[in-house]
Structure formats: structure tokens, C-alpha cells
A protein has these predicted regions:
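Hydrophobic N-terminal alpha-helices or hydrophobic patches in metabolic proteins across all domains
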Residues: 1-253
Length: 253
């Protein structure tokens, strides 16, 4: 079969998987999301020391009835974002050469990353960190964006063969994140919610940019701190050595 046709079919399968999961999540109950809520809750119990019990059509309630892990805590949007980032990156990097097995492999990796990000997000919420200059809703949104985009960026760096992280390369996970968290809700008419949506829009737009900028600054600082200047004698030896080698080569010719 023509490689371009295979590539197009792979792109179509990836897109349909993401859309199908997005639609499923939009109507799913906590009972239907136990495949991701249950392992997430188990990890939260391990790392937080709290215990939770499942309540049908509600979610996992803590034993002291102060915290609920409900459907919005499932992290399916992060799962979709991670899956799209991994698969689209593979399709772009190995254009017309990618094998079909990368799709289920990306799904498994994205699921594992989602469990880690979800567990971290919920444990942060359980820690009752107080950010005085934000109200409760703003802090919840702030923590969510920082944790989820931070883990998405980390996943990109780890799976992208740990190449040099340039600003142009980091635009890829940023663009995927914006597409899922901003473009899709906007096209679905979420902007009709008014001020609440635009506040959410501002957080999701600005915080990832600050994270990327902070990462690049830290990377530059690290490289500058580990740049060891060569002694003058070494530089001279290399210079004269290379010129000597060149002269010998010319004589040999």
C-alpha cells in the first residue's frame, strides 16, 4: 500500500481515537470511569495516607468525608492530550515510515503518565497549600495547569530522545495543550459562560508560557554554569597541532 495512504490512515485513527474518548468522557459517570479513577485513587492512598471508598454515581469519597475524587478528577483530558502529543510527534518525525504499533504503545505510555500526573494533582490538592493572592477556585485552576502541563512537558522531553530542548521544539507540546484545553472548549461554545471562562482561558494561556520560559532560562543558566573555559596552553596546542597536521598533509600530497 502507498506510504502516504498508510500515513493518512494512521492520522485518521489517531484523530478518531481522541475524538471518541473526548465524547465518551463528556457523558461518562464515575461508575463508567472506574478504569482510571480506581488506579488513581489507589496511588493517592499510597502517597497521601488517606483512605477512600467508592460511592456509586459520585466517586471515591475520603473516609473523613472531606474530599471527593469525582469524574472531573479522572484526568481524561490529560490522557487525550498526552496521547495526541505522542502520536502526532511520531507521525511527524517518522513521516510515512511509522509502524502501526506506535498507536497502542502511545496509549499505554499516556495512560501511565496520566496516573502519575493525576496522583500528583490530587495529592497537591490534599496538602491544603494556601496561596494567599488567589481564591479557592483560582488556586485549584493554578495547581491543575502547573501540574498537568508540567508533566506533559516532562513526558515530551523524556520520550523525544532527550534531544536539546529548543524553544521551537517546545512549541509542539504547548500547541497540543492549547488545542485540547482552549481551542476545543472555545469551539464548543464555552465562552458563553462569560467571565468564568475568560478567567480560565487566561490561566491556561499564560501559565504554560511561563513554565516553558522558566525551563529555557534554567537550561541556559545550567549550560552557562557548566561551560568550562579551556586553558590558554590547551588552546595553543590545539591550534598549532592542527596547523602542523595540515602542513604535513600538504607535504604528503
Amino acid at each position: 500500500m502507498n506510504r502516504k495512504l498508510i500515513w493518512g490512515a494512521q492520522l485518521a485513527v489517531v484523530t478518531l481515537c481522541a475524538l471518541a474518548l473526548k465524547y465518551y468522557y463528556s457523558t461518562a459517570t464515575p461508575d463508567q470511569l472506574r478504569w482510571i479513577l480506581a488506579p488513581t485513587t489507589l496511588l493517592v492512598e499510597v502517597f497521601s495516607g488517606k483512605s477512600f471508598a467508592f460511592e456509586s454515581y459520585t466517586g471515591y469519597m475520603s473516609s473523613d468525608h472531606t474530599f471527593l475524587i469525582a469524574a472531573p478528577c479522572a484526568g481524561v483530558n490529560y490522557l487525550i492530550t498526552a496521547f495526541l502529543m505522542l502520536t502526532l510527534r511520531q507521525l511527524w518525525r517518522d513521516r510515512f515510515e511509522a509502524k502501526w504499533h506506535f498507536i497502542p504503545l502511545a496509549a499505554v505510555i499516556a495512560f501511565g503518565a496520566t496516573l502519575i500526573a493525576n496522583t500528583t494533582r490530587i495529592c497537591v490538592a490534599l496538602s491544603d497549600i494556601d496561596i494567599s493572592w488567589l481564591n479557592a477556585h483560582q488556586q485549584h485552576r493554578f495547581e491543575g495547569v502547573v501540574v498537568y502541563f508540567g508533566f506533559l512537558l516532562l513526558l515530551f522531553l523524556v520520550t523525544d530522545r532527550l534531544r536539546s530542548a529548543t524553544s521551537s521544539r517546545l512549541l509542539f507540546p504547548l500547541g497540543i495543550y492549547y488545542a485540547v484545553t482552549l481551542a476545543v472548549p472555545f469551539l464548543n461554545g464555552s465562552y458563553h459562560q462569560g467571565a468564568a471562562f475568560w478567567e480560565h482561558f487566561s490561566f491556561v494561556l499564560v501559565l504554560p508560557l511561563l513554565i516553558v520560559l522558566g525551563f529555557l532560562v534554567a537550561q541556559l543558566a545550567y549550560r552557562a554554569g557548566h561551560a568550562i573555559p579551556l586553558p590558554l596552553s590547551t588552546v595553543a596546542n590545539r591550534a598549532f597541532g592542527s596547523s602542523t597536521t595540515s602542513s604535513r598533509s600538504s607535504r604528503d600530497d
